[in-house]
Amino acid sequence: MKRQRARRLGELLKKEISDIILREVKDPRIGFISVTDVEVSNDLRHAKVFVSVYGDEKERKETMEGLEKATGYIRKLIGERVKVYYTPEILFRYDDSLEHGARINELLKKVKEEEESDREEG
């Protein structure tokens, strides 16, 4: 039961945090990002927010710094929007799974091209 509540709260937080970052946070360091997942602890007191950042390493670093600075403000707005007994502490984490997936796809594509090339030669 607790796990289900944590999962539901995570989905709600994902939606609300995405909206807050898009519409409310005005920090110029925060670039184009996507909230990919939110993991809420079973006691509902902590939330890890995973974000994917579009851009180079410098832009990613600046975006993560901007998010860290805006964490208190984001948490305050979450407290106003989401009716829970305790507003979870928010911790932002960079999610590189999209980049990792793109890299794997690129490698698979390269292997396939090499196999086709070998078949044509042989």
Curated annotation (Swiss-Prot):
SUPFAM superfamilies: Ribosome-binding factor A, RbfA. It is found in: Cytoplasm. GO terms for cellular component: cytosol. Its main location: cytoplasm. Gene3D superfamilies: 3.30.300.20. GO terms for biological process: maturation of SSU-rRNA. Keywords: Cytoplasm, Ribosome biogenesis. Transmembrane segments: none annotated. One of its GO terms (molecular function) is ribosomal small subunit binding. Pfam families: RBFA. One of several proteins that assist in the late maturation steps of the functional core of the 30S ribosomal subunit. Associates with free 30S ribosomal subunits (but not with 30S subunits that are part of 70S ribosomes or polysomes). Required for efficient processing of 16S rRNA. May interact with the 5'-terminal helix region of 16S rRNA. Belongs to the RbfA family. Monomer. Binds 30S ribosomal subunits, but not 50S ribosomal subunits or 70S ribosomes. This is Ribosome-binding factor A. The gene is rbfA.
